[in-house]
Amino acid sequence: KAQPIGDLFRGDVKRITILSLIVCACSLTAWWAFLFWNQQHFRNLAIDAGLDVKSRERLVSAAFFLVIGVSIPGNFFAGYLAKIFGYSRAIVIMFIGFFASMAFTFFIPRSYIELLYWAPAIGFFSGVFALFTMYLPPLFPTLLRTTGAGFCFNIGRISAAFGTVFFGLFSQVGDFRQALFYASFLFIPAIICAVLLPEPKDLKQ
C-alpha cells in the first residue's frame, strides 16, 4: 500500500525529500531546456548561415540524435563512476561536468558547426539520469521508497515543463543561446543539494 505524500515531509525524511526535490527539479529543468531550446538555436543558426529548409531540418535532426546517442556511453560512464566512488559522488561529478559543458558551450556565440562539436559533451553528462532510478528509492525508508522516488522525480518533470518555457522568455527574439547559458546555472543548486544527500546504505559497497 502506498504511503501518504505527507509522510515525506515529517521527521528526518523531510530533509531528504526537499533536497531530492531540488536535485530533480533543477537538473531536469536544465536538461529539458537544453533539449528543447538547443534545437531552436540550431535552426536559427542554420537560417543565418543561409541553409535551405531541407538542409537545416536535417541538421537539427542530426544534432538531436547525436546528443541522444552520446548519452548512451554517458550512462555507462555514470555507472562506472558510481561503482568506484558511490552513487552520491558520481552524481555530483556528472553534474559538475553537465554544468561546465553546458555553460562553456553557450557562453559565447558559436556557429552551428562549432556546436556540433560541443553539444555532444552535454549529452554525455546527461548519462547521470541513469543513476536516479537506483539512487533515489534507497534514500527513503522502506515503506516510502516508491512514493518518495516517484514524487520527487515527477515534481521534477513538472518543474522542467514550466522551467523550459520560463527560460525561453529570458532569450532575446531569435537568440536562444542566452536561455541555454542561464539554464546551465541550475546545476549549481543541484550540485549543492547532491553533496548534502547521503549515500544510501543499500548502495554502499
Regions found by a protein language model. Name each.
Residues G74-G86:
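Helix-to-loop junctions at the C-terminal end of transmembrane segments
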Residues I96-R110:
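C-terminal ends and interior cores of transmembrane alpha-helices
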Residues D12-P73:
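Extracytoplasmic gate region of multi-pass secondary transporters
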Residues F185-Q205:
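Multi-pass alpha-helical transporter architecture, strongest
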Residues F42-R43, L81-A82, F167-D175:
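Interfacial helix-cap and linker-helix signal at transmembrane-aqueous boundaries
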Residues I113-G127:
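Hydrophobic core of transmembrane alpha-helices in multi-pass small-molecule transporters
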Residues K83-F95:
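Cytoplasmic membrane-interface "Motif A"-like loop-to-helix N-cap segments
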Residues T142-S171:
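A late C-terminal transmembrane helix in Major Facilitator Superfamily
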